Amino acid sequence: MGRLHSHRHGKSHSIRPSSPKAPSWIQGPGEVEDLIVKYAKEGLAPSQIGSKLRDQHAIPLTRPITGKSVTQIMEEHGATPELPEDLNNIVQKAVGLQRHLRANKGDRRNVRSLELIEAKVHRLDVYYKRIGRIPKDWKYKSVVAQLE
């Protein structure tokens, strides 16, 4: 699958564990769910929780053990963030680029980058409103028009 705003194909990806079975050293799904809820209450994003489970607790995948994804477990325990992780990451990237452009007025190339980032924000905005993940009245305010 190609990238959204480039001509590249996107070959990079992580290698999934070879065995879809649950590891033998895990006592049960309750232990994994407790860890996920604990890390979610500490403010970690779902991808950070997955990395922490993989690196520190030797749990490669949560779905074979619990039958649910990390975000589903977070939703069950009421520990989901107000914005989905991918939308939040793109909004944070746009905010950082806006801060950069305020300090560097002559950087015209990154004005275009900000336009592309904000296009991704609006695309995700429509999707998450349609599935009901964010409120219908949520609005991202564009800054590109003010910079030109």
From Swiss-Prot:
Return the Pfam families for the record.
Answer: Ribosomal_S13_N, Ribosomal_S15
- Highest taxon listed in the record's lineage: Archaea
Q: Where is the composition biased (Basic residues)?
A: 1-14
Q: Provide the GO MF annotations for this entry.
A: small ribosomal subunit rRNA binding; structural constituent of ribosome
Q: Example GO biological process term? A: translation
Give the start-end ranges of region Disordered: 1-27
| InterPro entries, A to Z | Ribosomal_uS15, Ribosomal_uS15_arc_euk, Ribosomal_uS15_N, uS15_NS1_RNA-bd_sf
- Got a GO cellular component term for this one? cytosolic small ribosomal subunit
> Ribonucleoprotein as a keyword?
yes
Question: Which keywords fit this entry according to its UniProt record?
Answer: Ribonucleoprotein, Ribosomal protein
The record's note on quaternary structure and interaction partners says: Part of the 30S ribosomal subunit.
Instruction: Name the protein family.
Output: Belongs to the universal ribosomal protein uS15 family.
Task: Spell out the protein name for this chain.
Answer: Small ribosomal subunit protein uS15
**Taxonomic source organism:** Cenarchaeum symbiosum (strain A)
